[in-house]
Structure formats: structure tokens, C-alpha cells
Amino acid sequence: MQTPKLIRPTLLSMAILSSMAWATGASAALVPPKGYDAPIEKIKTGDHSFSCEAIPKPYTDKLVFRSKYEGSDKARATLNAVSEEAFRDATKDITTLERGVSKVVMQYMRDGRPEQLDCALNMMTTWAKADALESREFNHTGKSMRKWALGSMSSAYLRLKFSESHPLANRQQDAKIIEAWFSKLADQVVSDWSNLPLDKINNHSYWAAWSVMATAVATNRQDLFDWAVKEYKVAANQVDKDGFLPNEMKRRQRALSYHNYALPPLAMIASFAQANGVDLRPENNGALKRLGDRVLAGVKDPSIFAEHNGEKQDMTDLKKDPKFAWLEPYCSLYTCSPDVLEEKHEKQPFKTFRLGGDLTKVYDPSHEKGDKGDNDGS
């Protein structure tokens, strides 16, 4: 049957409008959640005690490190003190850089001193120019360090790139060098963590996806954004109907800790996706909410996890407030209950270098408490 002539222009118009809308959507620049546009708090010009610490030596060697769980069985739940010390020693320069960038960016966003901006950018450009962390020789612990470092730096850098104070306006050459380096590292992280069998996909993959999401926005790369979203969906579909992650339940006495550790990258990815018009909350029937609720219930009553895997839970890590930094993006995605909000406010501010610094300043600035908090995150 022929389409009536009167309808043809309408269909054509719809097609044109549809293609225009698609083109507009495809070209829209990626952005972080709203709080990342915050200006410098108060520009200070008087005497100060700030001094830029020595930049750690760029790590250009192969990324092969001992695991802190060396000698443990498949559960990877028993720490080896000797190998942990060796790991900390071998990766010291990397973690010093991560912590340093995060700390100095926070200081700059508070005080606005040019010396602070110089310090943060010099740390990153020094490592970028040395092609640090790019080695193709790595083991599992090594590729883990690469994605952690990338996530730490790129998420701190977002505070500079998107601030309405425009601190990078006159530092475009530095920005170009840093973003090109982040981009290369992200490509390698994608390669490192792609196509793993489902039984090998756990919190490490989620943290890799977070580092790629932060870099996607820092470098405006849609392909990286799409990969992070894809990995999030894999993670969400690992959450069972009761809110447990089977691969993290294998961690025996540390199962609850690792469920909690899985939440920061997933909540951040969902928050960043939402800022760019992608709502990941419905994935696998609200998997992120289910996981968050299960962890919060487990923290109140660890026997929930003990009954599920037969192991009394080690609560050591869960006594550290920064371990709950995921509550900031989580409570921006969902309406948290009054008791959860009360707990969140008691623990604030949440400063964790692996998520780029002070998340309370980004997500809940009215509850910021100045210098409280230690920027934990390991």
C-alpha cells in the first residue's frame, strides 16, 4: 500500500529530526556530576606554609609486584605480612604520587594558590613525560596498580578541569600532556581487564572500570565511557537476588569487606553515567541498590554474611570511615533512609584518594567539615 502523500513530509521531518537528535547526543561532551564544577573555595594570597613535596621518581619499570596475599589459598583472604611489606615498598612511589596529587588538588581547590596548582600539574606532567606506568610487562598485582593509579589521578584532575574557576585556562599545554597520558593508560587498562571469564571478574574489574570512566570524562572519549558502562553492567548482573556477589563471597572472613570494597567504583560509575544521561540504576532489577542495602545490613549484623558463607567476618577495614565513601554517590542516586543519612553525616567528610579526594565536597558540600579526614583509600 502506498503511503499517502500528506504523510510523507511528516515522516521525512521525523527522520531528519531523529538524525539531528542522534548527532547532537553523539557529539555532546562528557561531563562529571554537578559538584565537580565547584569553584575554588576562597583564594588566599597571604603568607602560607605550603611547600610542594619532592615528586616521586616516575615508575617506568615492569609492573610486576608481589601480592599481599602471597601464599594464601584460592580465597585470597589471608594477608602475608612479609609479602605485603615487599609490595608496599615496591609500589611506594606510585602510591605517593596518587596520594600527593589528590592532596594537593584538594588544597588548591580550598586555597587557590598558584604554587599548589603548579605542584599538582608538575607531578602529573613529570610522570606523563616519562611514559610512567605504561609497561606491557605485568602481573595481576601490577595491572591492578596501573588502574588504581589512573583512577586516583584522573578523578582528582576532574576537579581542575571542570571547576568554574577554570584553573587550567592558562595551562593548556600541561593539560594536553596529562590527558594524552591518561588516554594511553586507559587504553592499556581496557586491554588489561577485557574479556575475562565471569568467575575472574570481581572488584578489581569494577575498579578498572571506574578508572576508565573517570578518564573518559577527563579526555572526552565516548569509547572509554561505553566500555566502563559495559563493565558496570557485567558487575550488576553478578549481584544475586539477595544482594550478594558470589565471587566476593569466596573471600571467606573478608567477604563483607570485599562487598563493601566493590561499592565505591560501582556507585561512582553509576553517578557519572547518570550525569551523561545514562541511568544504570535499573540494571539487573536494581542491583546496585540491592548490593548497597545488603552491605549496610551486613555492617549492622555481620552474621548475615557468616550464615551465607560459614565464616565469621573480619570487621577491621569496616571500622575506617573512608571505606564508606561510596555513600556519597549512592545517596545521590537513591533516597537514603534517615538512619543511613545520619550514619553518613557522622562519618563525613569522605576523603579517599582512589576516588579523587574529598567526595563530600563534591556530593554533599553542606556537610563538609574542613580538614577532618585523612584521604585514605588503599
Swiss-Prot record:
> What does the similarity note say?
Belongs to the polysaccharide lyase 5 family.
**Organism in which the protein naturally occurs:** Pseudomonas syringae pv. syringae (strain B728a)
Reaction catalyzed: Eliminative cleavage of alginate to give oligosaccharides with 4-deoxy-alpha-L-erythro-hex-4-enuronosyl groups at their non-reducing ends and beta-D-mannuronate at their reducing end
**First-level EC class:** lyase
**Molecular function as annotated in GO:** poly(beta-D-mannuronate) lyase activity
What cellular component terms from Gene Ontology apply here? periplasmic space
Specify whether Chloroplast is a keyword of the entry.
Answer: no
Q: Which gene encodes it?
A: algL
Show the InterPro entries listed in the entry.
Alginate_lyase, Alginate_lyase_dom, Chondroitin_lyas
Is the Flavoprotein keyword given for this protein? no
User: Which residues lie in Basic and acidic residues bias regions?
Assistant: 364-378
| Primary location | periplasm
Q: Which GO terms describe its biological process?
A: alginic acid catabolic process
List the protein's name: Alginate lyase
Any idea which UniProt keywords this protein has?
A: Lyase, Periplasm, Signal
Q: Where is this region: Disordered?
A: 359-378
**What is the residue range of the signal peptide feature?**
1-28
CDD domains, per this entry?
AlgLyase
Residue positions annotated to bind substrate are: S67, K68, H140, T141, Y258
